Amino acid sequence: IEGFSFSPDGRKLLFIAQVKTVKSTADKHPDLPKATGIVVTDLMYKHWDEWVTTAPHPFVADFDGNAISNVKDILEGLPYESPMKPWGGIEQLAWSPESDKVAFTCRMKTGLAYAISTDSDIYEYDVNKGGFINLCKQNAKDSDGKDEMAGYDTNPQYSPDGKYIAWQSMERDGYEADQNRLCVMDRATGEKRFVSKAFESNVDAFLWNKDSRSIYFIGVWHGETQIYNIDLAGNDKLTRLTDGMHDYASLALC
C-alpha cells in the first residue's frame, strides 16, 4: 500500500496499490526463464529510474475497525494509473463528505499518446453503485467558453458542505509549465469557474475553509511563497494573508 485515506464516516478505506499492466519477458517467453532483456515497442516504458511494469490503482474497501473487506479496484481491468506517476500520491484522490463518492486524478491514455500529453482529468467514482464519470469534460464546455479542459487537472478536494469540488487545472495539453489555476465546480449544476484569475502565478497547495465559502492557498509571487484567500461568496475576491521574505510550504486548519 502506497497511500491511504479513511472515509469521513470511518467505515471505508481508500488506498493505492500497484497493479501489473505490462507483460514481462518471462510472461511473453516462458521457455526463456533466465532472460533479462526487455523488448520496447512503444512509450511509455520508463519513468526516471524505473521500468514501467505496473500502474498505481485506487482501491476502495469496507473497514470495520479491525480489517478491510469487499475490496474494489476503481480502475479494474484498465491500464491507466491513478495517482499519476512519477510524483502523484494520495493528494490526487479525495472522499466526498458523504463518503459515497471518490474523486480521482487520471490521464486515460497509453503509449505515445500518454507520453506526450498532459491531459489528465478529474473523475468521480460512485462507491455504492460502481462506475465513474469525467467531471472535467462532462458538459464539453466549461463556463469560460473553452472547448474542453485540455491540460493537467489534478488534486481534487470536496467542499465541507459537499456542494462543490475544487481542483488545480492547467489550460493547454502538452505544456507541463502552464499556469496552475484553481477550478471550482458546482456539483448540482456541473458549472465550472476559475476562481484564481486575480492571481497571476500558480495556485499550489490549497484548502477549503470550514464554511465552504472561501479557499486558502499558497502561491509564489516575486520569489516568495505566501498564503492567500479567495472569497467565493464575494466575486472571488483575492486577499493576501501573509507578508515577509519567507516561504510557506503547507496549509492546515485548526
Can you annotate each of these PLM segments?
Residues 15-77, 105-108, 112-123, 180-182, ...:
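Predominantly five- to eight-bladed beta-propeller fold
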Residues 8-9, 97-98, 160-161, 210-211, ...:
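Residue-level detector of Asp-centered blade-edge/turn motifs that repeat once per structural unit
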Residues 1-19, 96, 101:
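Hydrophobic, aliphatic-enriched repeat segments that assemble into extended interaction scaffolds
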Residues 10-14, 102, 162-165, 215, ...:
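Hydrophobic beta-strand positions that form the internal "hydrophobic ladder"
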Residues 227:
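Terminal RNA-binding accessory module
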Residues 1-2, 33, 62-89, 114-118, ...:
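Multi-bladed beta-propeller domains
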